[in-house]
C-alpha cells in the first residue's frame, strides 16, 4: 500500500511542478495554489518513504541512504525551480537538474523495491 501512495505522490509532484511552470504566466493565483498542493504531496512522499525504508535497507543500505538523499534533493530542486519561476528568474538550470535528479531517484526507487508496485 505504501508503495502505491509513494508512487502516486511522486507522479503528482512531477505533474504539478510541470503544470505550475507552464501556467505561471497566465495565472499567479493558480501557480501559488499548485505550489501549496505540491507541498502536501511532499508530506505524503516523506511519510510513505519512512514507512518503506526498512525494505530498501534490506536490499542495499548504501543505495537506500543515497535514494533518501536524492529524494530530499528533488524536493529542494522543485522548491528552487518554483521560487525562481515566481521571481521571474531563469529556470533552465534548475529544470535540467530536476529532470536528472528525478530520473535517478525513480530508477533507484524501482531498483530497491524490485519494481514494486509497477512491475510485480
Swiss-Prot record:
Membrane topology: Multi-pass membrane protein
Keywords: Cell membrane, Membrane, Transmembrane, Transmembrane helix
One family name in Pfam for this protein: DUF1516
Transmembrane segments: 3-23, 33-53, 62-82, 92-112
GO cellular component, one term: plasma membrane
Keyword Coiled coil set for record: no
Keyword Cell inner membrane part of the UniProt annotation: no
Main location: membrane
Subcellular location: Cell membrane
Source species, domain of life: Bacteria
NCBIfam families for the chain: PRK13673.1-4
Family: Belongs to the UPF0344 family.
Protein name: UPF0344 protein Lm4b_02292
